[in-house]
Amino acid sequence: MVKANNTMFQFYLVMMDFFGKYLSEKYSQSNYIEDTKHYQTVIITKIVQMFHSLELLTKNTLDEVSARCLLRSLLDCVTTYSFIYQRKDENDMLFRHYLYALDGWREYKKSVITILEDNEYKDKEDYGCDYVINQIEEKLKKHIYYAKDRVTANLLILNSNWKYESLQNPRSLKYGEMYSAIGFTNKSIDYFQGYLSQFAHGLCLSNKPTADSEQMNRVLYECIPIADKFIQTMNQTFRDKRMIDLFLRTDDIKKFMDSKGFSFDDLAEFAHALIRKDKTLLI
């Protein structure tokens, strides 16, 4: 089972690489904060690279702690991406997108720029930080949500709160609640918040004896639900039929099936992954 799922992980990597390249070329460089499609490609590129780094860790080291810390980081990155951008309401998605960007720039200003001495080297982003923050705030104040409920919108802007539950209940969700909101099962959430947290926060289980290769393989096995959610989010966010058609026609699939590690015994596992219980398809 572990081998089959690790082979499936390799297939997911092939899929991610293709989708990431296709979307990055289609939605190329943009300087407009409201260009959410391009911004998503930046996030997607980052996440795909993290999946590749996880593979390298599990193949080339026995560093289970670093691998599981990276797995937890991947989980949070995929959760954030899905929580913000996989929404039926375009207005809600755009408002959260602005708040997410505002949160990042404000944190950059607070944590990086303000501690630099005047004679230290500064990136051009350092000098333009206030300008960018002001531009994002202006976008938020022109959004339909601001006209609809100015008091709540101002509260969300003040706290850069892209994690809000709803305009009617603007409290900030915790990550465990966001895991649930994007569709992870309670069993998966218990694993994320329990077992993975032991490694991410330096708790007792992170001090166990050195892992073996089988334990490292299990990290990829446990990564499958996260990779699955990531691919599902890309497809449901962009809804690009041409991307799927091109992928299914590409030589990448044939190369993967011709690779040394592939076994036709794994096809049943692929079927379970690509066709869900509710008869929906991953791609």
PLM region descriptions:
Residues Y22-R87:
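Long, hydrophobic/aromatic-enriched structural stretches that serve as scaffold segments
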Residues C69-D76, N91-Y100, D212-E222:
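Amphipathic alpha-helical scaffolding segments
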Residues V78-D89, L203, F238, R242:
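A generic secondary-structure signal for well-formed alpha-helical elements
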